[in-house]
Amino acid sequence: MAGCNDIHAADRRYALQIMKRVFGYAASVDTTGLKAQESYAYLKYDIRANKRNCLLLAIPTMYAIANTGVREHVGETYDRVIMKRPGDMRLTQMLERNTIPYGMRTMPTVLKYLTPLIYDELLIDGRIISPFHVRNRRFYRYKVSPFMRGAVIVSFRPRLKNTKLVRGWARIEESTGRILETSFDGEYDLVRFHVTMTTGDEGVKTLMPAQCNLNARFLFLGNDITAEYTTVFDLPKRLPDSTRIVNRRDTALLNIVRPIPTNSHEQYLYSRYYAARDAAQADTTKHSHKRKTWTKILWKNVGRRLLMRTRQKFGTHEQGNFRISPVLNPLSFSYSGRRGLTYKFDVRGSYFFNERQGLQLRFKTGYSFKQKQIYFDFPFTFYINQRRNAYIRTEWSSGRHIYNSEMMDAIRLERKDSIDWSRLNLTNFRDHSFKAVAHYDPSSHWGLEVGIVSHKRTAIDDHSFNFLGRKDSYNSVAPIAELTYRPLGYNGPILTIDYERGIRGMLGSDTDYERLEIDGQYKHHLSALSYLQLRAGTGFYTHKGFGSYFLDYSNFRENNIPGGWNDDWACSFELLNSGWYNASKYYVRANAAYETPLLLLSWLPIAGRLIEKERIYVNALTVKQLNPYIEYGYGFSTRALSLGMFVAQRNWHFDGMGLRVNVELFRHW
């Protein structure tokens, strides 16, 4: 264990041996033949608003406690837990009660801290680097101290201050390296947390928490919210099968299953809440109260929709759900030097009839303030058989700007008269498209997709075309086919071959062409913390009929509704002028992105502690007149924003530099 050079103990060899046992304990637990296990869990919590102001209304999941006169709320839940394997726990809520207005969930992001995976690389929901995994020993310093017969104390602290690292201690079983109890502190996503947990007694249960306590504190621009959570796992079944839960807020049933009695202060808060609720219901006949009630309803249904993400399940078995992004939220905006400020709005929904069949839809729209253009993308998918990835999908898109100089060149050859061409805009068009495909995977290695796609391209400046007596819109309709090959199955690289054939006269098409594209993508996880993402591809036109002016590709196009850090930053061109996407009969591209924490800026003394992830980008492209075009970039993500800095070369000469900024504040809330 040469990586443990900084372990401080009286007997260095003994300390190294203890840490070797800790790092290897999870692998020593026999999980072969493990079947899904059912148990139950109980959670109780207390949330207090010590200080608050109007800004709390705009923070996701904080609307309920910001818009009430009560400063302290309590609650409890009783859940069914299905564990298929260590770390894979599915919780289904059976009973709950709380004093939060409207029954809304508050600070659900901190619930992840109640199920730490202490032996995994990532301790909490992919956020915190675990000190108990062998690959992470380079991030921590350890000290082993004797405690009592058969047990030792291991203290750990980070080598540098960073939001993804924690400090604390663990009580370790000396002979096996099993963690009996641990406590750690940290700060992530504006939440300071202190976690104390004990593990199970035997077998696979020793890898999971038996009881976990969390103290959390949220500080943001004058708001101070503290919360205490206690969770007890692996509870036996206490409700008979004949018990049918009609009301999830049934206090009598909660009294049966509750392993921790409520204290006098919690009882007081519940009694106060029920008394206020009953008094409000008794006064609903008063006119003055009706006006006040309608005001509350307006704030509840309109105000929270504007400021909070809306999620809702529906159906007899909650087989349907939808999610609507908040209308007014920092996450709705992004900025890049080329695109300017962009506003985004997203609606998603799904409904599943059974395990194989279902419906999914998404409406994604955006507005570019620089281009003064609305974009939207509306895919709708009907899954026929999810196990075979068999589906029918339609997609309607509009607003994308494309550049085409071939038409202007053709018009200039036809018109020999003296015209001030610089005053005419004959190169910029707006693309409206509709696509319908059927997809089927005969195996995990192969996939086949066939369908049809249509485009209507209209001139942004129709007056210029009217002045020259030319039409200002052009249509194309093309059958399409795509063959997918996955050499290693669904978790490996993906190779695709796309074929598109535009037919003049088909459904009003006035364009004929033939195009082929080949694309390969692979995201290789070097560890749970780091990955290398690669993409390479080419596309070319094998035929272009007379009057077929437009060049457009499926795998090489500008994304007009950019997402955040985890959406589309890797393997995309950030500084490339939009005109180059449609300016060549061929393209060859290659993209690479490497992401890891604690790479460069994370080591800075003060600002480095805020950096969560870092990336290095290299993007290369060859098209007509660009041989080559290369972008070099570096990016990082923090709790508040993600930022990418890029430098471009065109034909080996400097071609500019730029920034891309996305708001990340409260993205995980």
Task: Spell out what each predicted region is.
Residues 343-349, 378-382, 436-440, 452, ...:
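Residues on the lipid-exposed face of transmembrane beta-strands in outer-membrane beta-barrel proteins
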Residues 339-343, 372-376, 430-434, 473-479, ...:
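Residues that define the transmembrane beta-barrel architecture of outer-membrane proteins
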Residues 391-408, 418-426, 490, 496-600:
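C-terminal outer-membrane beta-barrel translocator/porin domains of Gram-negative envelope proteins
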